[in-house]
Swiss-Prot record:
Annotated S-adenosyl-L-methionine binding sites: 75, 80, 128-129, 144
Originating gene: rsmG
Similarity comment: family membership: Belongs to the methyltransferase superfamily. RNA methyltransferase RsmG family.
HAMAP family per the UniProt record, alphabetical: 16SrRNA_methyltr_G
Catalytic activity: guanosine(527) in 16S rRNA + S-adenosyl-L-methionine = N(7)-methylguanosine(527) in 16S rRNA + S-adenosyl-L-homocysteine
Stored InterPro entries: rRNA_ssu_MeTfrase_G (IPR003682), SAM-dependent_MTases_sf (IPR029063)
A cellular-component GO term for this protein: cytosol
Keyword Transferase annotated: yes
Its biological purpose: Specifically methylates the N7 position of guanine in position 527 of 16S rRNA.
A Pfam family matched in the record: GidB
Protein name, per record: Ribosomal RNA small subunit methyltransferase G
Enzyme Commission code: 2.1.1.170
Domain of life: Bacteria
Subcellular location: Cytoplasm
Length: 213
């Protein structure tokens, strides 16, 4: 896929995307492919369609909170959506994203990617729970393919209950996860359809509170 085709595909999601951001995302794809030969950053079956399946899918989040400058991505894995978001924040004065990833090799890749792309990302090789008191409450918390919605609430509760908004990407079972999570939690919800996968959504969560008997 040529750079121009990838740039045009980006503009279908973020019409005002700059060429500089597009170049960073293309460079990230190239770096991801190189590292994937040595460590498992994503399912091998998805690498053939890496641009659409992972990068464009992650791009969708930034326009939903484009005014935010302080982001946090938990369980960052191979950098989706964390490094992708960082590519957009690179052109935002004061923008920064914290990436939390417990797997050492993946955290090493994230650090390499952040440095290679010159993006404002801080990588924490640690368990999410250990960062509750170390990372200041961001404006937005993101997660992709990490855990069930209820478990995500538990992992991100210190930040979400302090005013942060969540953007969680979910697959075809999202409604079941929503229903199950409402047993123990109250929250405001906006469902954004995915532009990449018709069976998926982005759940925008705010005002999270744990229910008490």
């Amino acid at each position: 896929m040529s750079a121009d085709i990838r740039f045009d595909s980006l503009k279908t999601i973020v019409p005002a995307v700059s060429r500089e951001t597009a170049d960073r995302l293309i460079a990230f794809e190239d770096l991801f492919r190189k590292w994937s030969k040595a460590i498992n950053l994503a399912s091998p079956s998805t690498l053939a369609d890496l641009w659409n399946r992972h990068i464009l899918d992650s791009v969708q989040l930034f326009p939903l909170a484009k005014e935010a400058t302080r982001w946090l991505d938990i369980g960052s894995g191979g950098g989706f959506p964390g490094i992708v978001t960082a590519c957009f924040l690179a052109e935002r004065s004061g923008g920064c994203i914290d990436l939390v990833e417990s797997a050492g090799k993946k955290a090493a890749f994230l650090r390499t990617a952040a440095g290679h792309l010159h993006v404002p990302a801080r990588v924490h090789s640690a368990r999410i729970e250990s960062m509750w008191e170390k990372i200041e409450t961001p404006q937005v918390v993101t997660a992709r393919a990490l855990a069930s919605l209820g478990d995500l609430f538990t992992l991100a509760e210190p930040w979400l209950s302090d005013g942060a908004k969540a953007l969680f990407q979910k697959g075809r079972d999202y409604q079941r996860e929503i229903d199950e999570s409402r047993v123990g939690w109250s929250f405001d919800l906006v469902k954004h359809p995915s532009a990449i996968d018709q069976a998926s959504v982005i759940l925008e969560i705010s005002n999270l509170r744990r229910k008490t008997d």
